[in-house]
Amino acid sequence: MGNYKTYRAYRYNLMPTKSWDYALQATYSEPLARKTYLQFSYQFKYGFSKSDRDTYDFSSLPSGTFGSLKPAYRSWDNYLGLLTNPLASYLDSNLSRYSEYRTYTHDMQVMLRMLHTKWKMNVGMKLQPQHSTYMQDYLGVHVDNKRSVVNWSPTFDFRYKFNAQSNLRINYNSTVSQPSMTQLLDIVDNTDPQNISKGNPNLKPAFTNRFRLFYNAFRQKHAQSVMTFADFSTTRNAIGNSVTYDGTTGARTVQPVNVNGNWDANAAVMFNTSIDSAGVWNINTFTRGSFNRYASYLQQNATSAVEKNITKYLTLGERLSASYRTSWLELALDGSVDYTHSKNNLQSLNNLSTWQFSYGGSLIFSLPWNMSLSTDLHQNSRRGYNDAALNTN
């Protein structure tokens, strides 16, 4: 990482917060034709939050003042009891921060709704004008910012009913996420000297597309059901972090930045059926998988350049169970396996391929007077972790 100098800082923060919000909504629907409607909705939302952080700087105290104390949860009084002066005398007004955040949001949506016997479809657009104010006193600088933006998001929802027990649904929506006011402030927060945060006034809004498919069916005669779904989402100009290091102090600076390349996908299939006409013997299987890709920017050490960091997660899972059911007894055996693979292109030490296993059974006796007696036994195992203590049974 470099040849660092010794840097010592003792700081104590008190940060009371207060927040509230309220909303008012109205909806109107106008028939256009048979089973076709145009729906308008409006909602006003107001939100308020306040933070009043006091930072006390104990860096002037002799080295080792708190060396005899062992860290413990909520043990602040142990540290404050060693101060040589009243706590108020250590208050640093520059490092303390007071802020107020107000948002005024208008949600306006128009939706075309078509309702038929076999299918239903909703197509619409949502507009969201938003006005925000942010006031802050920090580092001797007074900030009073105002921002007005208009977010928009199209929506699509289609449902098809094959019969009373089988249906298909396809859904699409998109959202625009604006960076927060604090992320846009061009201010460096070094309250924690080793973990510095920095704003970025050049942030762009993030735009996310989401697609979902869902299908389920049920056959009463065989007590047979099937369900499957698939999700996919991708984000343009996602707001991630850029992490850099100071070669002199070893301090880490985190700044929000726009990154591209974030997407994820999930899918699953469930099948349940009885294997005899009486429904006494049953089997169930649930298969699932997901893939996630996240991007950020990282400086691996003080002398290297900032590089794009890609982290990928792959998860596969399977659960299988079988059961025997009568009017007074239910016996079930089940087992599951989950595989997770994570890969980081810059930090190979974080790459992992892990397995989790679970298997066992349960037994339930039905007794008179609506009473029951149950017991179960399961074994859980984990494998593939770098720390041997985590590879447990």
Protein language model regions, located:
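Primarily recognizes Gram-negative and organellar outer-membrane beta-barrels
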Residues: 1-393
